[in-house]
Amino acid sequence: MRKLSFLVLLFLFFLNACAKEKKEASIIKASNQDLEIVAAYTEAYKALSQGDPYFAAKKFLEAELLFPQSEWAPRSALLASYSYYMQNYYTEALNNLERFLITYPNSKNLVYAHYLIAMCYYETIEGEKKDSAPIYKAKAKFNYISKNFPNTDFALDSEFKLDLIDDILAAKEMYIGRHYIKKGKWIAAINRFKTVASEYDQTVFIEEALHR
């Protein structure tokens, strides 16, 4: 569901721009290079819609290379990253997104790149018993989006994701606190519960933390 919702947001955003570019392409006589990029772009969209995101990523990157100075290039790079994300190739998606931010620092689609980076980290969160690194990286990026791109759908969804992340972090503190209790490390346990009470007081764990 999460991936589908992002796909809808992304495609809605690009729909008008792509339609306008195709209309202009039909009026102006296209060069061979123009035709190549349109063909690659169309093939990539088709592959993505038919459930072959890895091939779609390859074609989007080809489109970017064919016309590096055009508006097609940053869109192609971003959609290639999304295609990797759809295939659960999060490392490839993150690498391409970081390249996107460096290559296209003035792109009007920066919010999408930041959001997709956050989602790549978010998708790798495995719960309170696992590595915390993806949790904090996702939280930092969602916070960045909320502060720097307010009044957008992505900021709204980022705030929702931040609430979910706080639940996970609170659960982690409670898990560690309970573990300390089993070991008889009372002070260490109390400190964990205090963290929940002070930093995650809006989560479902607040009552248990205060009771402890």
Language-model features, listed with the residues they occupy:
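Acidic, polar-rich low-complexity tracts and alpha-helical solenoid repeat scaffolds
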Residues: 14-212
